[in-house]
């Protein structure tokens, strides 16, 4: 119980440091939080999902997308093992992996992750078509945003 609490505190501190542009402190605290979850075999719990998602986003911002993907793949495996690969948590991780693939210009892999996520959303939200449509829109809007960011990156590297 205490490990859970301390882990959440580190995750929250990491999030605050990230918001304030202190990436190294953010990374340090996020890693401490995740380490505690690992040490006490709590990685399968619901709390680990946003922690690892946020950590993966930070790693991607720090130009470490491979480490981010590795963390998310490990999380996806745990969710599949302890819950299933048809639950919303699994879909959320697939979506995060799709985002990282988009950011790193791995479009075909991004599509694969987004399709897996959408299939789960469609099944879970079968009675709520407006949620499905909202999620489709959200994912579709990522493509042009990433395209613009990639173009800026290419242009910036030419200067």
Tell me what each language-model feature is.
Residues 1, 39-44, 81-86, 123-130:
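Short coil/turn linkers that connect adjacent helices within long alpha-helical scaffolds
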Residues 4-19, 30, 46-61, 88-99, ...:
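Conserved alpha-helical positions within TPR/SEL1-like repeat arrays
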Residues 111-159:
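C-terminal non-catalytic interaction modules
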Residues 61, 81, 96-103, 116-123:
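Short basic/hydrophobic patches in alpha-helices and adjacent helix-turn junctions
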Residues 34-39, 73-81, 118-122:
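Amphipathic alpha-helical segments of tetratricopeptide repeats
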Residues 4, 19-25, 39:
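Extended non-membrane alpha-helical scaffolds
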């Amino acid at each position: 119980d205490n490990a859970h609490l301390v882990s959440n505190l580190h995750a929250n501190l990491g999030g605050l440091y990230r918001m304030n542009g202190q990436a190294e402190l953010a990374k340090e605290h996020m890693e401490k939080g995740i380490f505690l979850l690992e040490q006490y075999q709590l990685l399968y719990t619901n709390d680990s999902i946003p922690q690892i998602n946020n950590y993966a986003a930070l790693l991607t911002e720090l130009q470490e997308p491979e480490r981010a993907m590795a963390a998310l793949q490990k999380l996806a495996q745990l969710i599949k093992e302890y819950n299933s690969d048809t639950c919303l948590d699994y879909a959320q991780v697939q979506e995060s992996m799709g985002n990282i693939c988009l950011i790193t210009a791995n479009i075909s892999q991004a599509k694969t992750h987004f399709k897996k996520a959408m299939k789960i959303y469609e099944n879970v939200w079968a009675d709520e078509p407006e949620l499905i449509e909202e999620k489709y829109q959200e994912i579709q809007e990522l493509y042009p945003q990433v395209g613009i960011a990639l173009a800026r990156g290419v242009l910036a590297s030419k200067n």
